Amino acid sequence: MWDSPIIFTTMRELVQSVSPAALSWAVVAIYLGTFFWLRSRSSKQRLPLPPGPRGLPLIGNSLQTPAVNPWEKYKEWSDEYGPVMTLSLGLTTTIILSSHQVANDLMEKKSTIYSSRPQLVMFNRLSGGMNSSGMEYGKRWRDHRSLQASVLRPWMTQRYTALRDVETKQLLAELLNTDDFSSCFKRMVASLFMTLAYGKRVQYPDDPEIRGMEELVRVKSEAGEASFRATGQLVEYIPLLQYLPSFLTPWKEMCDRICEQFNKTFVDRLRDGINAPAWTWAKEVSKHKVARPMSELEISYTLGTLYEASLTSQQILRIIVLVAALYPEKTAKAQEELDRVVGTGRLPAAADARNLPYIDAFVKEALRWRPFAPLGAPRESIRDVEYNGYLIPKGATILVNQWALDYNEDMFPEPFSFLPERWVANPNLPFSTFGFGQRGCPGRYFAQDSLFISTARLLWAFNIRTASPVEVEDMLRNPSAGAFLSPIPEFDATFTARDAQRKALIEKEWEISPKESYAILQEVEKELISEGAE
C-alpha cells in the first residue's frame, strides 16, 4: 500500500536549489576542470573527433542546443556534418549517431564498448546507485540484467498470455462505458506488471498503487531530464560540486528523502510478491543464484526498475489511438484484415499474429511515425575507438538520434506520412524503437506481445474518432517535450463499438473472465511448467 506521498511539485525545484555560493565554487571548478580536460585531450587525441558545429569556449554547443525537441536540430546538423557528429556540451564530448548503419556498427557490433551509462550525480543519488538503467557497464549491471531476463525471456513472455487475455478483456469492457482511454491504459499496464511481479491485480484506474508508483517514476524521469539542462548541468559537468557542504547543496537532502521513499516502496512490494500465494516474479528472482549475495533492497530494485520501463507501453497505446483517430482509412484496412481472419464471433488471440501482418505493420509504423523517446537513453564509451577515421573517445556520451533514424527519407520515403503498407511491402525495414545491443529494453518481447494483442482487440472492437483531427495533429507535431522524451499530450477520442454483436461479446467475455490474480497466475505457472517439461 502507498503510505506517505512525496510532497513536492517538480524536479525543477530540486535543481534550482543549488545555491549562489555553489555557483561561485562552480566557476573555479570549471576553469580548473577545463585546464586539465583540455591538456588530457590534446595529449591523447591522435585522430580527429567526428565533425560538428563550432561551439564557444568552455560552454561548447550548449547555447545552440534547444531545450525542446533537440533531436530535430540534431538531425538538421547531421544532414550537414554526417551520421556521426560531435557536440561539445560544457566539458562533455557528445557523439550523435544518426543512421541505422552507424548505430548497428557501434551499438550492436561493438555493444560491450557502448553499453555503459554516463554517471549522473542527481539520478544516481535518487536510487542510491541501485537503478540498473543508470548503472555503469560491469558485473553489477550484468547481474541485475540477468535477474530481469530470468522472467522476460521470449519463451517466458509468450506464456503470460492468460494475463494479457484478462487485462485486455477488462480494457475493452471499460471502454464501452468511458472515453477516458488514458486512465484505462494506465490501469491495464500497471496491472500487467503488478500481477506478474507482486501477485496483485490493479482492478480500478484510481487505485492508489498506480498514483504512488507513478509519482516515483515521474520524479526519477524529471531528474534524468534535469541532469542535462539548467542548473542541474553544473552538478553533472562538475561532479566535485556534490562534495560541497550540505548548506551549499540542499538538493542532496531532497534526493535522499526521495530515495528513501523509493527504497521503502520497492522493498514492500518485493515482500508482498514473495508472500503472495501464487507464482510471481518476486519469487522467481529472489531464488535465482545471482540474487544470493544481493541484499533485499538490491533485489527489489531489479523489479522496481522494470516498472518504469513498462510505463512506456501507456505512451505507445496512446500513439495507437492517435493514429487510429487521425487516419481512419488505415484503420479501416486494419479492421478489414481482422474481420477476414478473426470474424465477429470471437476476440483476436495471440495465435492470430502470423495471419495479421497489417496489424503488426500498424504498430511498427505508429512507433516510427511518433517515437516516444527520440534520443533514447545516453550511453558512454568505455575506451577510445576509431571509426571511419575518427576518434570516439573514452568517456564520451553517445546518443542515438532515433528521430533521425525514423525520419530518414531514403529508408522511409514520405516520413511524415503514416504508411503501414511500407512494413508489409518490406518486413525487413529496420525497427529500433526498443534500442540497440546489450542495453536495449529488457522487456521488449513482453512489450511487443502486449502491444500486438491490445492493438488487435482495440481495432477489432471499436471505431475510434477525434472531434478535431487537424488541431490534434498540429498540437502533436509541436509537442512540449524535454531533452530526451517526447510524451504524447492529452487529447480527446471517442470509442464506439463497431456493432451490437461485438459489444455483447465483449461484455460476455469480461463477465466470465477470472478477476483474481491467484487464478490467473496459476494458469501462467502451468504454462511455464509445461514449457519446462518440454
UniProtKB/Swiss-Prot annotation:
List all disulphide bridges recorded for this chain: none
In which domain of life is the source organism classified?
A: Eukaryota
In the record, what terms sit under GO molecular function? heme binding; iron ion binding; monooxygenase activity; oxidoreductase activity, acting on paired donors, with incorporation or reduction of molecular oxygen
- Is Metal-binding a UniProt keyword of this protein? yes
**Which reactions fall under this protein's catalytic activity?**
preechinulin + reduced [NADPH--hemoprotein reductase] + O2 = neoechinulin A + oxidized [NADPH--hemoprotein reductase] + 2 H2O + H(+)
Enumerate the transmembrane spans.
Answer: 18-38
EC number(s) per UniProt? 1.-.-.-
Subcellular location, record wording: Membrane
* Transmembrane keyword on record: yes
How would you describe this protein's topology in the membrane? Answer: Single-pass membrane protein
Q: Which cofactor does it need?
A: heme
Q: What is its main location?
A: membrane
Residues that bind heme: C441
Its pathway is: Secondary metabolite biosynthesis; Alkaloid biosynthesis
Q: Which GO terms describe its cellular component?
A: membrane
Question: Which keywords appear in this protein's UniProt record, sorted alphabetically?
Answer: Heme, Iron, Membrane, Metal-binding, Monooxygenase, Oxidoreductase, Transmembrane, Transmembrane helix
As for family, the record states: Belongs to the cytochrome P450 family.
Outline what the protein does: Cytochrome P450 monooxygenase; part of the gene cluster that mediates the biosynthesis of echinulin family alkaloid. The pathway begins with the biosynthesis of the cyclic dipeptide cyclo-L-Trp-L-Ala (cyclo-TA) by the NRPS echPS via condensation of L-alanine and L-tryptophan. The prenyltransferase echPT1 then catalyzes the first prenylation step, a reverse prenylation reaction at C2, to yield preechinulin. Preechinulin is the substrate of the cytochrome P450 monooxygenase echP450 that catalyzes the formation of the double bond between C10 and C11 to produce neoechulin A.
Q: What is this protein called?
A: Echilunin cytochrome P450 monooxygenase
The uppermost taxa in this organism's lineage are: Eukaryota, Fungi, Dikarya, Ascomycota, Pezizomycotina
Which gene produces this protein?
echP450
